[in-house]
């Protein structure tokens, strides 16, 4: 068990369109409870004096400003879907403020998607104002990665049929957009203080995401001290009502939630 202190900030906890979606008239979308408003999912980890971002969606700028954050040591990407990478252009102020390229770690397929989505960042000549990335392929998902003295364990999982990654950082693990966790990955998820699991809604079942009952079942199997659910749609229901139904060690995450342990 790690002995360093953690601070976890949930920058966003919503599904790909956020909550509410444009034009929504359902009761959850019209709720006055700020915990029912969800930007796209991302988490900011402060651990061993490092600042780590997992995923960088379209709300990244808004999220960083809301939390008064202005530095990232490196970014981990789970997969290439738009709601998880399209905010990468907005790392430019961090490039300027801290005079550094932004290290990004992901599967080779995801690194290629970053190049495809942001081709202007990789032109061969210097142009003022471009984002600057330092791209790192995670070639072997069976090997841990050591980044600035922080051990990162890639966690192969499935988003439907798409192979993606979760990540373990010490006693914390993040499994968004998950539909299936291989047994070999579950073996890497023992002894956790906190695990974050994607849980799209209560029902119906979904082909590429866990619903709440399935996420609870996975949480019980992993037996972390505390479990938080993320990547939540309006179909989950009201935060307050759902939270009251959950076991004592399980929680709906919400935007701006901070954990210290």
Segments predicted by a language model, with ranges:
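Binuclear metal-dependent hydrolase catalytic cores
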Residues: 1-175, 184, 241-261
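Cap/insert and terminal regions of metallo-dependent hydrolase folds
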Residues: 180-261
